[in-house]
Amino acid sequence: MAHKKGVGSSRNGRDSNPKMRGVKRFGGEHVRAGNIIVRQCGTKIKPGENVGVGRDWTLYALVDGVVQFGHYSRTQKMVSVIPVTAAETAH
């Protein structure tokens, strides 16, 4: 077995592309239907009311409204969208 590394080989040089995951709309922010709220791997944050789940566990708004984060259980979080009526948005 060789005790010297062969010339011309490199063990480094690999790096994956960034996936741009994370929270995209924070609590209290207004969202339109279809806006992405969270990009995640797995159900780290659970969908609440008026929130849909994409194929890759992306959470998105189903209605126009305001984002609200809360607790799903003692250890898990949940995100909901509280609908806003047209009269409230006029102010």
From Swiss-Prot:
Origin: domain of life: Bacteria
Pfam families for this protein: Ribosomal_L27 (PF01016)
GO biological process terms, semicolon-separated: translation
Recorded GO CC terms: cytosolic large ribosomal subunit
A GO term for molecular function: structural constituent of ribosome
Cystine residue pairs: none
Region feature (Disordered): 1-26
The keyword DNA-binding appears for this protein: no
UniProt xrefs under Gene3D superfamilies: 2.40.50.100
Family: Belongs to the bacterial ribosomal protein bL27 family.
Alphabetical list of HAMAP family matching this protein: Ribosomal_bL27
Name of the protein in question: Large ribosomal subunit protein bL27
Source organism of the structure: Chloroflexus aurantiacus (strain ATCC 29366 / DSM 635 / J-10-fl)
Lineage: Bacteria, Bacillati, Chloroflexota, Chloroflexia, Chloroflexales
Gene: rpmA
